[in-house]
Amino acid sequence: MSQLKLEKHSSRKRSILLIIKLLIILVSVLGCAKNETYRDNIVPDISVNNIKLSDTTSVVLGYSDLKYNVIEGKEELPYVIFTNENKTEILKLYLFYGAKRNEFYQAEISPYDKKTISNPTKYKNFSTESGIKLGISKKDLIKIKGNIFVETNHVLRYEISDYEKSHFLEKYNMPIYFAEYTFDQDKLCKIHFGFEYP
């Protein structure tokens, strides 16, 4: 009988030790997770290198009037295209039909393509006001922009579409704001954000 008591006591002791070990592991995992903070809402970007969307007074460094630089295609909105100083990046600024001169509603940053005819700038690189630029990791982007996105084929899409509840959309009088971030091998290779054409 005393042998049975010893076995029960030993079994109970092992169970308690196992529970304590599991609690220690759980606490350490939760402690590590606290260091990773993510936003649960989107803070929209509205500018690239201080070139603000929907602002006719915001001009591209070195260009005061872009009406002669506008490219009109059949498949997309009219746009103006720029390169950074080292010709490693492209900035495409899209205009809406009927918009005022130099009034852009979408911005797209991508790697330089030698086939592209573009306007040179003095900017070292292109980045948004929240610090988003080509080459950052998906993890870093999510830390900055938040975790409320839809991911499809290596593209993270953030969207604000509730006009009735969004002071941001109301301010710009636009129905939908979007931001799309394309990744290749966990590196950001394309940024496209702005307002959808109504």
Residue map of PLM features:
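Sec-dependent signal peptide recognition
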Residues: 15-25
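Second-shell loop/turn segments in exported
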Residues: 46, 125-132
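A cross-family detector of function-defining hotspots
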Residues: 55-109, 136-187, 193-198
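N-terminal secretory signal peptides that target proteins for export/translocation
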Residues: 1-15
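Post-signal peptide N-terminal segment of mature Sec-exported envelope proteins
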Residues: 40-58
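Bacterial signal peptide processing site
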Residues: 33-35
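A structural motif
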Residues: 105-120
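C-terminal motif of bacterial Sec signal peptides marking the signal peptidase cleavage site
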Residues: 29-31
